C-alpha cells in the first residue's frame, strides 16, 4: 500500500519543482518565494529540512541534482533569467551539529536574456555537463572542465529551437550506439502548427547538436518531458506531459537508409495516450529502470503507468496527496501494491504547479 505522508514545506509561495537525488534519500524543492530547500530522509522515514536559502531574485522554476560522483551539487533556474550551481560544504561547523547543511553558490549562468525555464545535468558518462532552456527558445549546454572547480563553466553549445522552451530531457542511454541526445518541449500556446517537441542529437563530425528528423506531432503546449532510462533497448521511450499523458517510442532508422552525414532519422510511434487526469498534466517522471511512469496533474493525483507483456500501457496506481481514496481508481487497470518499491526511485519531480511559467 502507498502511504501518503504530508510534509510541511514552509515555502511562502507555489512550489514549482521537487527533485530527488540519485539514491532517493535527499530531496530539493523550489518555489516562487525565490528559495530552494533541501530535505534529508531520516532512518524512521521522516523528511527533515536541512537547508533553506534564497537562490534567485525571481520565481525558481526547477531544481535538479548532479550525480553523486560529482559531490552534493544542485542546479536551479529562475524567472530572473539565470541558472545557478550550488555545492554543499561539509565542515566542522555547528550547523552540522544542529542538523543543518551549508550550500555555496559556485557559479551563475547569465547568458539568457529571458526566463530560464528548465535545467538538467547530463548523464554522468558525459562528464559534468548542464543544459538550460529559456523562454527565448534557446537551449544552452555548459561543461565544467575541472570537476573539482565548479566555479568554472564554459558554454559549449547554443541550440535555437525557434519556439519558447519549457522543458528539456537528456537521453540517459550510455550505449556507444547512441549519440548524446536532448529532447526539448515548448509551452507556446500560439495556434501555429509547429511541433512542440524537438529532438537534437550530437554529431561527432560537426561537433554540434543537430535537429533529428522526426515526425513528432505534438501541437499542444508541453509542460514536461522525460526520456526513460534505457536498459539495453535498441529504441528510446519518451514521455510527455501536456493536456494529457503521452508515451512515444523513437526507433533509429538504420544508418544505411539515411543520407550519409545527415541528421539521424527516427521512426516515431505513439504507444500510449491517457487523459485520466481530466486536466493539464504538469510532470512526468520515470522510475530508475524505465518501466513505470508517474504523472501529476491539476486533478491533484499522481498516476502510475506500466506496460504489460503485450506492451499495452495501463494505469497501475493512483495516489492522492491527502491519502484519501480516488474516485474512479478502477480506470485503466487496478492499483498494484507491489509497485510500492518504485517510489524512492522516481527521479525528479512529481509535483507540478498549475501556475505555468510566465515569460519575460
Swiss-Prot record:
Cite the location of the cross-link Glycyl lysine isopeptide (Lys-Gly) (interchain with G-Cter in SUMO2) from the record. 12
**Its Gene Ontology biological processes?**
attachment of mitotic spindle microtubules to kinetochore; cell division; cellular response to amino acid starvation; cellular response to nutrient levels; defense response to Gram-positive bacterium; mitotic metaphase chromosome alignment; mRNA transport; negative regulation of TORC1 signaling
Q: Which domain of life is it from?
A: Eukaryota
Specify residue ranges for compositional bias: Polar residues: 324-354
Alphabetized GO MF terms: structural molecule activity
Modified sites of kind Phosphoserine: 179, 190
Q: Does the keyword Protein transport apply?
A: yes
S-S pairs: none
Keyword terms, alphabetized = Cell cycle, Cell division, Centromere, Chromosome, Chromosome partition, Isopeptide bond, Kinetochore, Lysosome, Membrane, Mitosis, mRNA transport, Nuclear pore complex, Nucleus, Phosphoprotein, Protein transport, Repeat, Translocation, Transport, Ubl conjugation, WD repeat
Segments for region (Disordered) = 324-360
Location relative to the cell: Chromosome, Centromere, Kinetochore; Nucleus, Nuclear pore complex; Lysosome membrane
Cross-referenced Pfam families: WD40
State the SMART domains in the record: WD40 (SM00320)
What does the record say about activity regulation? The GATOR2 complex is negatively regulated by the upstream amino acid sensors CASTOR1 and SESN2, which sequester the GATOR2 complex in absence of amino acids. In the presence of abundant amino acids, GATOR2 is released from CASTOR1 and SESN2 and activated.
Q: What is its main location?
A: nucleus
Question: Could you tell me which residues the WD repeats occupy?
Answer: 10-49, 55-96, 111-152, 160-210, 217-258, 276-315
Cellular component GO terms, alphabetically? cytosol; GATOR2 complex; kinetochore; lysosomal membrane; nuclear envelope; nuclear pore; nuclear pore outer ring; Seh1-associated complex
Subunit composition and interactions: Component of the Nup107-160 subcomplex of the nuclear pore complex (NPC). The Nup107-160 subcomplex includes NUP160, NUP133, NUP107, NUP98, NUP85, NUP43, NUP37, SEH1 and SEC13. The SEH1 subunit appears to be only weakly associated with the Nup107-160 subcomplex. Component of the GATOR2 subcomplex, composed of MIOS, SEC13, SEH1L, WDR24 and WDR59. The GATOR2 complex interacts with CASTOR1 and CASTOR2; the interaction is negatively regulated by arginine. The GATOR2 complex interacts with SESN1, SESN2 and SESN3; the interaction is negatively regulated by amino acids.
Family listed: Belongs to the WD repeat SEC13 family.
Functional description taken from the UniProt entry: Component of the Nup107-160 subcomplex of the nuclear pore complex (NPC). The Nup107-160 subcomplex is required for the assembly of a functional NPC. The Nup107-160 subcomplex is also required for normal kinetochore microtubule attachment, mitotic progression and chromosome segregation. This subunit plays a role in recruitment of the Nup107-160 subcomplex to the kinetochore.
Any idea what this protein is called? Nucleoporin SEH1
